[in-house]
């Protein structure tokens, strides 16, 4: 019986999942973007290199899908549609899910809509939640959400993803789980800005709470259940990403608070900042649906150089008082 898994995307999260799931599969095929990435993985991910000699096989060809029972996409949102286009003829009905967060940058759609465009015969499934890749590799306990409208698909992937250290919950609200996973990255930039400006716990609490309200408003407008945002993929992921410097988005915000340019801040992070990629898309979707997202709006203005971090905070504080 085939007991192999293909993970497409050999960044921090894809690599962490390969390590975490390596005891559950005979083989895990980790597909890197190109040969250059393949050659450098051993030095970039020391924990991965230790597992490589066992049952994690790193390559750059999608042909390994033929030897796998399921496929998990772990690429940035900017690569999501191109990956689907490349593999759609190789799946042959095999289960597929993704851990990618964000909106499709080409269309502004949630990723399950892009998925349905390329793979209409499959049930879309997203896996999301408050998880830092580094802590997953270190086998620190965590919880995650498997979301799909299809009950069998949820059950299948929750069984795959759950380990002794990673607890999987299921949710039928695939829209809400995706919105939470995308918007929290934008709000983490705001939290980083606040931290970089020297503000304290009061400010962080206000940002997280009011940020959650913005996330919920947008999600409900797109058809999500507001209860979803009280769970792991909403509040849980938001608290994690806003509160710890393992978050690239938070670190990016702290860089912006030092009054350097957006380009320089991105260079200093030297890794994918999904919140920055999602920012314009989130605000476009919000405006199209007439949803107020003042915190996210100010983050956008800061990244565009249209206001300073301090001015953004002042603008938020001077807004007309309103009911919570």
For the regions a language model picked out, list residue spans one by one.
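Rossmann-like NAD(P)(H) cofactor-binding subdomain of soluble oxidoreductases
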Residues: 51-139, 157-159
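NAD(P)-dependent Rossmann-like dehydrogenase/reductase catalytic/cofactor-binding core
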Residues: 191-192, 220-230, 234, 238-324
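Alpha-helix C-terminal capping/helix-to-coil transition sites in glycosyltransferase folds
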Residues: 66-67, 183, 235
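Conserved hydrophobic helix-helix packing surfaces used for dimerization/oligomerization
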Residues: 4-5, 96, 144
